[in-house]
UniProtKB/Swiss-Prot annotation:
Pathway: Lipid metabolism; malonyl-CoA biosynthesis; malonyl-CoA from acetyl-CoA: step 1/1. The gene is accD. Its cofactor is Zn(2+). This is Acetyl-coenzyme A carboxylase carboxyl transferase subunit beta. Belongs to the AccD/PCCB family. Keywords: ATP-binding, Cytoplasm, Fatty acid biosynthesis, Fatty acid metabolism, Lipid biosynthesis, Lipid metabolism, Metal-binding, Nucleotide-binding, Transferase, Zinc, Zinc-finger. GO terms for molecular function: acetyl-CoA carboxylase activity; ATP binding; carboxyl- or carbamoyltransferase activity; zinc ion binding. The keyword Transmembrane does not apply. The lineage of its organism: Bacteria, Pseudomonadati, Pseudomonadota, Gammaproteobacteria, Pasteurellales.
Amino acid sequence: MSWINRIFSKSPSSSTRKANVPEGVWTKCTSCEQVLYSEELKRNLYVCPKCGHHMRIDARERLLKLLDEGSSQEIAADLEPKDILKFKDLKKYKDRINAAQKETGEKDALITMTGTLYDMPIVVAASNFAFMGGSMGSVVGAKFVKAAEKAMEMNCPFVCFSASGGARMQEALFSLMQMAKTSAVLAQMREKGVPFISVLADPTLGGVSASFAMLGDLNIAEPKALIGFAGPRVIEQTVREKLPEGFQRSEFLLEKGAIDMIVKRSEMRQTLASVLSKLTNQPSPFVEPELISEDE
């Protein structure tokens, strides 16, 4: 090594500059890999301004951005999961719960609230994918049922945002039972004529897609969301065939009639308000343009 190389090898330039950038200031888009300013991304509801990719968004933040400011009130916030089976795989289930709670600041994978949307009363729920993949266990099922019962009590619509890998395997049959439990309460809602809208975000899979997520009076999806029971890789390995382009993405499902609408996150609030006003026979929160006759 020459003397000049030795001097430059000791220079703190690159490593120091890198260390001086606070963590979390920049975020790389998981689709186009553009480096984005995190605050701008947050203002854009975690949708990449370069390519339009819908990244995962925190469940609580999603609901607070949806509801009218100051109108939210959480439902069943005290419910916490318990390791009834003393389940252990690579780690103890209770250790996984503790780690997820520490990482997310939430007690489980579903957040439920009441509030208003353009002054319309509404009950909302959202899966937190960061909490054990948004998996559905006993607490998720119980909170979903309590939210649905609250909607029937208030006679107002219920909107649920799903982003889940499916049933929580660490709870075995207790988690599978939630599929029947959540489906049963939605049947009660239907009998009472209370609207339920399901919004499917990326990903919505397994026992969640096989139960409440696909049982909406209206099933809406975010763009390019992965929706299905088993994932595409598992299906390819099982059938040993190449799957069609875009298989299990929301655009593919809309084309095949499995969902009703695809709505961008930036347009979700207005779209839901417009749809719910029609379903509940209330005046539209938006000013409709007046039709001008040719005589005027």
